[in-house]
Every structure is written in C-alpha cells, then in structure tokens.
Swiss-Prot record:
Pfam families from the UniProt entry: Ral
Keyword line: Host-virus interaction, Inhibition of host innate immune response by virus, Restriction-modification system evasion by virus, Viral immunoevasion
Sequence similarity: Belongs to the lambda phage ral family.
UniProt cross-references to InterPro entries, sorted A to Z: Antirestriction_protein_Ral
The species this protein was found in: Escherichia phage lambda
Protein's UniProt name: Restriction inhibitor protein ral
Function: Ral interferes with the cleavage of DNA by E.coli EcoK restriction-modification system, by modifying the activity of the host methylase. This modulation allows incoming, unmodified phages to escape the host's restriction system.
Length: 66
C-alpha cells in the first residue's frame, strides 16, 4: 500500500516548517539515516522522532480548537 502526502499542505501548516529544505526539525541526522537493529527489530529513529513532532503539533492544534 502506498500513501502520498502533499508536503506543502501537511508540513506547511507548522510554523517551524521551512518548506522541506532540510533546515527544519524534520532534518535527518547522520545517526538516523538508516534503520538500526534494537532487540531483534529494525527501528527507524527518524520516523519515530518526526512522528512525535507531528503528534505534538497536532496536540497543540487540538488544544487551540478546544
């Protein structure tokens, strides 16, 4: 299954977004370039970090709406 995300629509809603020019919090750090094996499972640290960032921003939006 493939999911396409319009980065301009999704990422652009966040104040810290720099338009995917790799200058934002989304930037891949060297130690996150490849998934690593932890406890017998592959872990994608960049995906975990950016998912947490997105969850945090969505939480802020929900708090403003409430």
């Amino acid at each position: 299954m493939t999911t396409t995300i319009d980065k301009n629509q999704w990422c652009g809603q966040f104040k810290r977004c720099n338009g995917c020019k790799l200058q934002s919090e989304c930037m891949v750090k060297p130690e996150e370039m490849f998934p690593v094996m932890e406890d017998g499972k592959y872990v994608d640290k960049w995906a975990i970090r950016t998912t947490a960032m997105i969850a945090r921003e969505l939480g802020k939006q929900n708090n403003k709406a409430a």
